Amino acid sequence: MEPIVFLPGMMCDARLFAPQLDALSRERAIMVAPTCVGERIEEIASNVLTSAPAKFALAGLSMGGIVAMEVYRRAPDRVTRIALMDTNPVSETPERAAAREPQIVKVKAGQLREVMRDEMKPQYLAPGPYRSEILQLCMEMAEDLGPEVFLRQSRALQRRRDQQSTLRKIKCPALVLCGEHDKLCTPERHQFMAELIPYSVFKVIGGAGHLPTLEQPKLVTDLMQEWLTQPFVLQ
């Protein structure tokens, strides 16, 4: 079985995928590659490829999905299958890029916690019994990574390229997945992504927002298990 490389989202680490790591690591090797080193998406993807196995399954959520698309663009022959979760294939709009600037100013002034609490975390999750626990975990991950990572990741996202042409070229088993209540990367955007990929499975996770790996972990893990057993008929 090929190993899996997971790519976490902005201000997240391996804990974003903890339920999936627990379930899937029983059967295969798993690596969580950092998305916090590098000034641009291209540089982050290059670092991933340097440390990744020769061939691997690739799964990214949010910013991790953006990096995953760049990894595939650079080395399609090394990616055996790809899962894109709660992510965005298009370049940043001028409006969204401008909206990051006040956040950057606040974080430079030592207000990372406030930015995460007031501006980012409220957009992340669907209503649910574990919402407060997951939000607390998001805060812990962000504070552990720190302000410099926030600044680098913000700039990298502002400068990212459009990956629609990359999606059209994907020739391996692809899973496109998002939370039903994701306000940052909507189900409609993911349906559009799935339509660009010649052979893909598109799933919307009920009862989840931007972080379904934590909000509905069993559903996501089950879908990933199915994705990992798809034959390499497209290779």
Give the location of each predicted region.
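Conserved alpha/beta-hydrolase catalytic His-Asp/Glu region
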Residues: 92-95, 111-169
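Catalytic histidine-centered segment of alpha/beta-hydrolase-like enzymes
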Residues: 208-221
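Short beta-strand/loop motif that positions the catalytic acidic residue
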Residues: 170, 176-178, 182
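Catalytic histidine neighborhood in serine/cysteine hydrolases
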Residues: 187, 191-210
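Flexible "cap/lid" loop of the alpha/beta hydrolase fold
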Residues: 73-118
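Conserved alpha/beta-hydrolase "acid-adjacent" motif
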Residues: 134, 183-189
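Conserved HGGG/HGGXW glycine-rich cap/lid loop of the alpha/beta-hydrolase fold
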Residues: 1-47, 61
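Gly/Ala-rich beta-loop-alpha elbow adjacent to hydrolase catalytic centers
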Residues: 60-64, 68
